[in-house]
Amino acid sequence: MGEQAGGWRAARIAVSLACRECKSRNYKTTKAPDQVVSLKKFCKQCKKHTVHDETK
């Protein structure tokens, strides 16, 4: 799926996801260098589903 024709895999970067409302870093994930990650996840601090943006 993420492999190229030569069998090598593209480099991925580890990022944290921070809640847009309370800025709490709740999740860690990986992404391709050219992507911008923004996901709707459950925030334990806010106790609701909010948008989480990537942080380094």
From Swiss-Prot:
GO biological process: translation
GO terms under cellular component: cytoplasm; ribonucleoprotein complex; ribosome
Protein family: Belongs to the bacterial ribosomal protein bL33 family.
Coiled-coil regions listed in the entry: none
Keywords, in A-Z order: Ribonucleoprotein, Ribosomal protein
Pfam family, one: Ribosomal_L33
GO molecular function: structural constituent of ribosome
HAMAP family per the UniProt record, alphabetical: Ribosomal_bL33
Designated name of the protein: Large ribosomal subunit protein bL33A
